[in-house]
Amino acid sequence: MDFRRQTLVSNGGSSQPQPSVPSSAIKKASRLGPARQSLAPSQIQSRTSILGVSNSQENASHGMMGSRKSTVPGKMGDRDQLMSASRGDGGIYGRTPQMNRGIPGSVRRSSVFTSNSQGRTSMAPGVYSTAYKDPRPLRDKVFQSNCMRNVNEYLISVRYPLPLTAKTLTSPTAKEFQSIFKFLVNDLVDPGAAWGKKFEDDTLSILKDLKYPGMDSVSKTALTAPGAPQSWPNMLAMLNWLVDLCKALDNWDDPEIISDPLMVPATELPLDYPNLDDRLLWDFAAKTYSQWFDGEAEEFDEAEQELEHAYGKSYSIVLNDTEQATDRMASATVAECEKLEREIQKRNVEIQQLHVQEVCSPITDRISFADKSYKPPLKKLEDEYVQLMSDKNKFISFLDQQGQKIEKIRLRISKVKEAVISQEAELEARQSELAHIEQAVAAQNLSPDEVQRMNHERDSLTRSLEDLRNKISEASQFAYDQEMVVTKSMDRFEGLLTDYNSLAHQIGLLDFSLDVPSLAANVNYNLDVDLGAEELEEVKAVGVRMRSTIWQALQTCREMFRQEALGLGNGTIALEDEFDKLGQSVERQKEEVGNLEVRLKIVHNQAEDAQSQIASENSDTNKIITQLETEVTNMLAASQQGVLSTQSQLESTRIAFKELRHKTALFQDSVVAEVGEHIDAIIKAKEHTANSLKSIRALAETQ
């Protein structure tokens, strides 16, 4: 037994390091609120709705229908890249709100106090070393169209209570997206699920619980403005994934669709299913146990008949398969014999032909001697046949290639004809338009000077319009750049705020259940910043409070904690010295305890020997009683006349048994008394040892 001091933190257990902060500290639900609205003009052209909800086609403008309306297209990965690229921990805190996820040691802040020894290296695998790449083509129009169609058809089939318009699945508002998401989650997870005040936090938690593979593409900014052009493809793919889960859940119990062998009755499983006998036995035991537990029956004839029927059916199937296999083997053998007979006949014919050629062998020998390239007629015909078949196959492949070329040429010709027809129609339209314009000009009766002046004004207006377009483009680009800078700053601030909340929870500044230092108890360390506020004075006021009040209070707390840690370190050194002294005294007492344990073991062995002797005597007595009862039974069966003598002998035997049992009880009492005395002696020895240890400890404390 090792009495050396051990650390309170176990090195074993879970291989995943657990954070020392509460789950609410990792991502506090800060009231960032909706972000500011962009003043940049829209550069995105409206597109035609591809949903088949209405017969008419409407132009759905791509804009932000939520609180923050970003009018400039952006990349979906910018947010996550900025969060992970600006700092090492940005991707962790920004992507896992309110989750008790283990934070790697590489992103934790190192202590301001020096340590005497380095801690052991963590053996946990790097969870954040590799990023999952979504293989789905989220930006593909065809993929988006299929997702919209799938979501729309499912919502209609399950009677979605709210109306579906043409813009619902092309550029929805935040309210529409939240309604669809809540409807799918309530249908899939829990119909009575409770939703908190922060829809974004609940959504991220639910998707993480459902193990959504594209969690990196779902952020709070995207959930706040789901209808934005840079956010909607990812949100649409996520809704399509939820719809597929709902469909799979609806078909979970359909025997025509599922293929899970655990949900199929054992009698319908194939014979080659592994552990079929165990499955039949398990079903039989489960069915009969439920009947027995309910008290319905003690015998299970119906279940036994079903089990016998299942085994009989399996045996009949095996027998039928064996017979069919035998028949197939017999038929195959007969066919093989017939084939061999035909082959023999063919070889016999060839032998006859060779015999005929041997009759003409002198002539053949002279020809072959004169011409080395001479071949027998049969061999020559076979070579010619092989060559002709090869030419035939080549010609067929050539015809196929030419047919494919003809089809391609026909398609090209049809496309050219269509282009020619469209060009002719356009030319006719332009000619008619030119004639109409010439008639209008002729009707106006304009002079050449007026025409020249109008052309000059048109050129000047065109140049002015082009200049305005260039200025608008430059202003839009500048607004886009500024908006990207603001977005990056907001994301970086969100990550820094998360770090601040986590560290504040660790030292107890935000957890009011802990003891807050007296110097910092009157300071509110909670940061509630609304970056989406219209008035910038509120944000500036929070910044002033951060620099003036909170920063000074944190410096004071740091100095106080440093002094406290220094005092605790000195106290720890003193306690370690005292602990070493006590350890030496305990080692001496351990030797005495070991001697007492040896004595106790000897006493236990003696008690066990006595118990074994008593058990052997009891077994002998039981054997005698059994033998006597057997003799009594035989005597009763042999003759009725010996009943009286047998009863008298039985009475005498019972009296002897009672005396023997009485003696056994007395002996047991004596043994128990001796064991009790030994136990009392052991208890007294332990009490004496404990009192000695207490006196030694008191003496050590006084010294």
From Swiss-Prot:
Biased composition, class Polar residues, residue ranges: 39-60, 108-121
Top-level taxonomic group: Eukaryota
Predominant localisation class: nucleus
Skewed-composition ranges (Low complexity): 9-24
Molecular functions (GO terms): microtubule binding
Places the protein is found: Nucleus; Chromosome, Centromere, Kinetochore
Gene Ontology annotations of biological process type: cell division; mitotic sister chromatid biorientation
Region Disordered, residue ranges: 1-132
Assigned keywords, A-Z: Cell cycle, Cell division, Centromere, Chromosome, Coiled coil, Kinetochore, Mitosis, Nucleus
Coiled coil: 326-358, 407-479, 573-616
Function: Acts as a component of the essential kinetochore-associated NDC80 complex, which is required for chromosome segregation and spindle checkpoint activity.
Similarity comment: family membership: Belongs to the NDC80/HEC1 family.
Protein name: Probable kinetochore protein NDC80
Biological source species: Cryptococcus neoformans var. neoformans serotype D (strain B-3501A)
